[in-house]
Amino acid sequence: MLQPSRRKYRKEQKGRNTGIATRGAKVSFGEFGLKAIGRGRLTARQIESARRAMTRHIKRGGRIWIRIFPDKPISKKPAEVRMGNGKGNPEYWVAEIQPGKVLYEMDGVDETLAREAFRLAAAKLPLETVFVHRQMG
């Protein structure tokens, strides 16, 4: 699963996920892409689960790019622990997603196969997504 190898600080404040994606909003590596039209956060497990679904569907052909990375730690207190006594330990990693962000890209396969692979991947994600083509020019 994806997670940063080194970080300056172990824990991060909650923050707010606002705005729309301006960077990473175009298909730039492959021919087809899966673009988020919803807002939310994807865990490292969800990103990996969607990647596996796509990889299994396209078998040997094609190439997949993951355009997102879970770089935000989410901390959680253990079960049945009283409030206070500091912040909990980092439990898992998430990528914050704004509408318009390209999540995955694919190349080397025909459109019908890519559409089906992205449909299977989208079923694993808690966001609304749309299939997109590369814009020429």
UniProtKB/Swiss-Prot annotation:
Cellular component aspect of the GO annotation: cytosolic large ribosomal subunit
GO biological process terms on file: translation
Recorded GO MF terms: rRNA binding; structural constituent of ribosome; tRNA binding
Pfam families listed in its UniProt record: Ribosomal_L16
UniProtKB keywords: Ribonucleoprotein, Ribosomal protein, RNA-binding, rRNA-binding, tRNA-binding
HAMAP family: Ribosomal_uL16
Family the entry assigns: Belongs to the universal ribosomal protein uL16 family.
PANTHER family tied to this protein: 50S/60S RIBOSOMAL PROTEIN L16, LARGE RIBOSOMAL SUBUNIT PROTEIN UL16M
Function: Binds 23S rRNA and is also seen to make contacts with the A and possibly P site tRNAs.
Subunit and partners: Part of the 50S ribosomal subunit.
UniProt name for this protein: Large ribosomal subunit protein uL16
Organism: Aromatoleum aromaticum (strain DSM 19018 / LMG 30748 / EbN1)
Lineage of the organism: Bacteria, Pseudomonadati, Pseudomonadota, Betaproteobacteria, Rhodocyclales
